[in-house]
């Protein structure tokens, strides 16, 4: 089956007032949704001047409530600009990104599976 690549969190720029902002992305289908057996997922984080954390959350629920989500990968940075990759494995039904930050810009978070 061909791999899928999609942006799960698009551009977000902090207003620059040092407040803590939280952005939770939409639900995106993971390998478990499609019945794939390998469960391999890769995310690409692309950010500039970011101070904060980006967490990838997953769920096994087909109609998830807030309590159904758990963390599978987190990066925490202080005033950093880079493109970074991470891999994780699991037959997750849905995946989403959660951004908590006090400065900077997230250009995108891309999911490949």
Name each model feature, range by range.
Residues 45, 49, 76:
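Polybasic, low-complexity nucleic-acid-binding and compaction segments
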Residues 1-37:
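Transition segment at domain starts
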Residues 31-38, 70-113:
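Beta-sandwich interaction modules
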Residues 51-71, 108-112:
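Short, surface-exposed beta-strand/strand-loop-strand elements in extracellular ectodomains
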Residues 44-46, 57, 98-100:
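Residue-level recognition of well-ordered beta-strand positions that form the cores
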Residues 48-53, 102-103:
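Short proline/glycine-enriched turn/loop motifs at strand-loop junctions of beta-rich domains
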Residues 39-43:
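Structural beta-strand segments of beta-rich domains
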């Amino acid at each position: 089956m061909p791999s899928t690549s999609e942006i799960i969190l698009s551009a977000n720029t902090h207003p620059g007032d040092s407040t803590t902002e939280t952005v939770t992305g939409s639900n995106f289908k993971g390998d478990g949704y499609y019945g794939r057996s390998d469960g391999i997922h890769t995310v690409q984080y692309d950010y500039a001047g970011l101070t904060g954390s980006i967490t990838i959350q997953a769920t096994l629920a087909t109609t998830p409530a807030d309590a159904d989500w758990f963390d599978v990968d987190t990066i925490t940075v202080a005033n950093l600009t880079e493109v970074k990759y991470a891999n994780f494995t699991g037959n997750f039904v849905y995946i989403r990104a959660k951004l908590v930050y006090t400065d900077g810009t997230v250009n995108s978070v891309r999911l490949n599976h």
